[in-house]
Design a protein with these regions (language model features):
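Short, conserved beta-strand element in jelly-roll/cupin
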Residues: 47-50, 60-77, 167-169, 181-200, ...
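Short acidic-glycine-tyrosine-enriched beta hairpin
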Residues: 81-96, 201-222
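Short, charged beta-turn/beta-strand-edge "cap" motif at the junction between a beta-strand
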Residues: 98-101, 223-225
Length: 264
C-alpha cells in the first residue's frame, strides 16, 4: 500500500522478494517433439504439468491450430473468457492464433497434453467431453478387442487435425496393419503397457519398442504402425495431421479386422 510524506509526495511501498527453488516451478511445459525432431511435416507435441493452485500464463500459436487433452487430474482451460473443465480424456480445440491458458483448482498435480499443426484458417472452438462421447454411438467405432472414440472428428472445423482415443483389451493388437499416404500421426500412451512397431515394409522392420504411460511415438507418412497391448488394458491418443478422415470410416475392410494390410 502506498503512502504520502509531509510534503504530499507519494511514497511507494517496498515489496519483498520471493525465492523460487530450482525444480519448484508451479507450471512446467515439456516439448516432446516438433516436426523436424519427429520426422514429420506438421505435428508438434508437448505436455503441461501444473501443481495445485498453479495458473499458466496465456499462450497462443500464431500459425497453428491445437488440441488439448485432459490426462491426469482435473484442469481448467481458459479461452475467450470461457472456462472449460478438462477431466480425464476431455478434449478442447484451440483455433489458430487464439490465446488460452490452464489452471489447476485441485489438490493434485495436473498433466495435460497438447498437439499442434500448421493452419491457415481460423475455426470455431470445440469442446469434447469424454463422458458424453463415450455414450454417443455415432462417435464410437467398435473393432475386435478394441474401441475407438472420435473426440475431434471430420464434422468439426479444422485445417489438418483429427483425434480420438483407442482403448485396447489386454493381449490385443491392431489388425490389419495400415498406413497412410496423406496423413501423419502421433500415438500418445496414457494407460497400460504395450509395444509398437513403425515400418515401411516387413522386410525393413526394425522399430519395435515397448511403450509405457507418457510415451509418444511419431508415425511419418507411409509407415505401418501396429500396437500391441500386453497384460493390461491400453489407452492412447491418436492424433492425425493431413487429410481429414479416420481409416475405418474411409476403408470398411479395416472394420472387419481381417485381410491384407490397408493403404489409404
Amino acid at each position: 500500500m502506498d503512502s504520502s510524506d509531509d510534503s504530499g509526495v507519494i511514497v511507494q511501498a517496498v515489496k519483498p522478494g520471493f525465492l523460487f527453488r530450482s525444480g519448484g516451478a508451479p507450471v512446467i511445459y515439456r516439448e516432446h517433439f516438433a516436426p523436424g525432431s519427429g520426422n514429420l511435416e506438421f505435428l508438434s507435441c508437448g505436455e503441461y504439468e501444473l501443481q495445485p493452485g498453479a495458473v499458466m500464463q496465456p499462450v497462443a500459436y500464431p500459425e497453428e491450430e491445437a488440441l488439448v487433452y485432459g490426462w491426469r487430474g482435473r484442469a481448467h482451460a481458459h479461452l475467450d473468457g470461457n472456462r472449460y473443465e478438462l477431466s480425464e480424456y476431455d478434449v478442447l480445440y484451440i483455433p489458430k492464433g487464439r490465446a488460452w491458458s490452464l489452471s489447476n483448482p485441485g489438490s493434485e498435480t495436473v498433466r495435460v497434453w497438447v498437439t499442434r499443426a500448421p493452419a491457415q484458417n481460423v475455426h470455431p472452438v470445440f469442446y469434447s467431453q469424454f463422458a458424453a462421447v463415450s455414450k454417443d454411438e455415432s462417435r464410437i467405432r467398435h473393432l475386435k478387442s478394441r474401441t475407438v472414440y472420435m473426440m475431434f472428428d471430420v464434422s468439426e472445423g479444422a485445417d489438418k487435425l483429427v483425434a480420438g482415443y483407442s482403448f485396447f483389451d489386454p493381449y490385443s493388437r491392431s489388425w490389419p496393419p495400415h498406413n497412410h499416404t496423406d496423413q501423419e500421426e502421433v500415438y500418445i500412451f496414457l494407460k497400460g503397457r504395450g509395444s509398437m512397431e513403425v515400418y515401411e515394409s516387413p522386410e525393413t522392420l526394425s522399430f519395435v519398442r515397448e511403450v509405457n504411460e507418457g510415451d509418444a511415438v511419431t508415425i511419418p507418412f507411409y509407415n505401418y504402425h501396429p500396437v500391441f497391448a500386453q497384460e493390461l488394458p491400453l489407452v492412447f491418443i491418436w492424433c492425425i495431421a493431413g487429410a481429414r478422415y479416420w481409416v475405418g470410416d474411409k476403408n470398411k475392410e479395416f472394420m472387419k479386422g481381417t485381410g491384407e494390410p490397408i493403404t489409404t
